[in-house]
């Protein structure tokens, strides 16, 4: 049984849903509007009794049918209301009959009602103005700057006592000035302190006196009726410090007829002869002048009058007038639109499908012309083997030969072949035999020997320049090229000239061992072009090594070994030529950048490790001297 009993009962929660699923015609419009789909769906999702899947499917069908009926009824009501509104507001249609084309006067006229304007106005006390404007009214303390009663600087200028910021004792009583203004000295600390208990009797006595009675006595130190610092400023009877000041009578504030500075200066030492305050220290240094704190006003009303504040009008930024930009071409012509429609190059691309098999995919990746001389037929995962393969396929021609060949200055064929076959092999030294005449032979009869290095050639050329200048024939023009199979004949020197050339070295004084400064040019005898060629060649080799190995340690060691061998060969030639016993690293690294100096220093350390040279240094950070080691001529 795929349904439950409560579904079929007329009182069940899903009775209307089941009826809509199986007998839709039995449902009336009232039944549809009474049905609550939300509660019905909740009952289907979480039923009280387990239902079969087919039963829940039937109930969902009933829910859809009831929802469809509700939507259909709503659409019908909307259409009916729309038609009625449209019919009611048709243009040109008057619903009035023929006899009632004119409207009644009362229907189109508003009644005139004159109100009684003689009613008394409400009392002003009924309106609570303070309550309405209390939010917009600020307190006096918030909008008024705090102003201290001016401190009199006369007391501080004339050493009337120690009036520091921390003094709490009031000046001696009974001191007043004759025919002077009422001088009140208050500091920030005195205003904020409470009166002490020792002056309570004095405060009670002073409360009964008027302002003008305080200054009756003219003598200093006799009267006990008043003091310079009025206790009423300290007491709390007249309000807070920042409250409105009490109204003073005109007789209370007296203006001085003449300044009393002269009298006060004369009586500095005599009048105030009483003891100082216990907090003061003798001798008392005069306090700096504070003229900004003294305020003397001639009128009582202007005592607390503030200066008017300028009304600052907020400046409004002037709006920049917008510039109307109109396109010159407002519409596209038919040719442009047709060209855009016919151009479909941006949505069409070539079909590039991957090969169906992995082998074809590999052939496609490695079968291009750019990969033929770079990758072997089989994949080599070892980086060193791959580099050896590419090295064999792409022979390295020295840069100097390449440039000489391009410039039309190539030497004979066997010299070019020797450098082509062994571009990286360090060449052995060949002792120059300049003074021994050799018979001229053909190229075929000569044995194949290695060409001396460029460094040795430069040393030899520097030594025989003077000899060849007198015996060399004039050079041929630059446009004439040498033939590949011929060697230029050596200049024939008569034996008389040879004897004359051999005589001058005998007459020279004995040679002295050259200095380090003379030794360094022997290592730096390479021409500028040769140096540039070697530098470019080293940079290319470093880039190739970095690209191929990716930081392989073996390749790094190989590159350093090559630089070390070049340094050793240069040292051997230079020391053999000059006869020096040592060489300075500082002189060797002169006129070089930081990278080249570091490479030479590292080469020295490697040669020291191999016992090819010996390094000595007198003190830290001083020059390093290199001398030949036990294996200097063996390596």
UniProtKB/Swiss-Prot annotation:
Stretches the record annotates as Interaction with STAG1: 362-403
Any one Gene Ontology BP term: negative regulation of mitotic metaphase/anaphase transition
Placement of covalent cross-link Glycyl lysine isopeptide (Lys-Gly) (interchain with G-Cter in SUMO2): 48, 216, 418
Modified residues (Phosphoserine): 46, 153, 175, 249, 458, 549
InterPro entries: NXP1_M-like, Rad21/Rec8-like, Rad21/Rec8_C_eu, Rad21_Rec8_N, ScpA-like_C, WH_DNA-bd_sf
Biased composition (Basic and acidic residues): 526-536
Annotated tissue distribution: Widely expressed with highest levels in testis, brain, kidney, heart and thymus. Lowest levels in skeletal muscle.
Annotated region (Required for interaction with SMARCA5), positions in chain: 126-282
Protein name as catalogued: Double-strand-break repair protein rad21 homolog
Organism, as annotated: Mus musculus
